[in-house]
């Protein structure tokens, strides 16, 4: 069911309502497409609807309800993406395969603020060269193209772990201080064993821009496919089906 609350949230010189579905994101996106809401109005689990478009949504079939009921219905449906104020929700991916016999709901969020390091179990880094190409790496364990990343080691900060993974997987040396936070992912297991503690379930996402154009990349021992530089369009051909790709697409736009 499509629900909308009253426009009360002030921003950009107007007030906004929240348009949600308590059934599926597909239903929500289909409705938004029919009424002509732009993709940029989507914030992870809802569309922000300016006051002047509110009546149009009601006329198209959205049910008017309270803000509290919107939150309650989202929570009950499992479609709510929890994030900090000011962060941008990209997508909540439901029951995606994480490993053998394991599935998680994953929240993809863009943010230039780091998350609490105590909650971070891993990090990944988008490395771009002077021309905007992306350093992509092959994961033997997951059998997919991605960007450098991995689990933190004992006593590492998230940025230190990310810089280490970059060096190990590409041969590029960057200082932890050069890595800018650009987003995070939250993993909530729903099927099978969890590989991390419930209270330590965030992956910090970083980005760094190099001054050089396509510096030489070094392959990590034991990896069957060497790292390479790819344009964002080429990277999409390699990885667009992965659960994390919507966040990557947003960051590489």
Model-derived segments and spans:
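NUDIX/MutT-family hydrolases
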Residues: 204-207, 216-246
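Short, compact, well-ordered microdomains
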Residues: 44-81
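Short glycine-/aliphatic-rich beta-strand segments at the starts of folded cytosolic domains
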Residues: 2-20
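Acidic, metal-coordinating catalytic segment for phosphate/diphosphate chemistry
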Residues: 71, 78-124
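Active-site-adjacent beta-strand/loop module that shapes the phosphate/pyrophosphate-binding cleft
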Residues: 185-216
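Conserved Nudix-box catalytic region and its N-terminal flanking loop in Nudix hydrolases
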Residues: 128-168
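Basic nucleic-acid-binding interfaces
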Residues: 17-45, 52-54, 60
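A short coil-to-beta-strand element that immediately follows conserved catalytic motifs
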Residues: 173-184
């Amino acid at each position: 069911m499509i629900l909308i609350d009253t426009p009360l949230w002030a921003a950009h010189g107007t007030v906004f309502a929240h348009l949600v579905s308590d059934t599926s994101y597909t239903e929500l996106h289909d409705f938004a497409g029919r009424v002509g809401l732009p993709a940029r109005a989507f914030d992870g689990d809802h569309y922000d609807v300016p006051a002047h478009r509110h009546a149009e949504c009601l006329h198209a079939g959205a049910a008017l309800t309270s803000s509290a009921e919107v939150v309650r219905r989202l929570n009950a449906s499992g479609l709510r993406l929890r994030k900090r104020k000011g962060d941008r929700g990209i997508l909540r991916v439901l029951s995606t395969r994480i490993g053998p016999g394991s599935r998680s709901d994953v929240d993809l969020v863009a943010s230039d603020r780091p998350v609490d390091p105590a909650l971070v179990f891993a990090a990944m880094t988008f490395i771009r060269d002077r021309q905007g190409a992306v350093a992509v790496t092959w994961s033997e364990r997951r059998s997919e193209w991605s960007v450098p990343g991995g689990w933190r080691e004992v006593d590492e900060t998230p940025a230190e772990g990310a810089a280490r993974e970059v060096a190990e997987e590409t041969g590029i040396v960057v200082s932890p201080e050069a890595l800018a936070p650009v987003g995070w992912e939250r993993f909530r297991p729903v099927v099978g064993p969890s590989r991390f503690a419930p209270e330590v379930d965030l992956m910090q996402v970083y980005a760094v821009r190099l001054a050089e154009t396509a510096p030489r990349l070094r392959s990590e021992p034991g990896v069957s496919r060497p790292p390479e530089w790819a344009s964002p369009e080429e990277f999409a051909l390699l990885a667009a089906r992965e659960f994390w790709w919507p966040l990557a697409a947003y960051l590489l736009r």
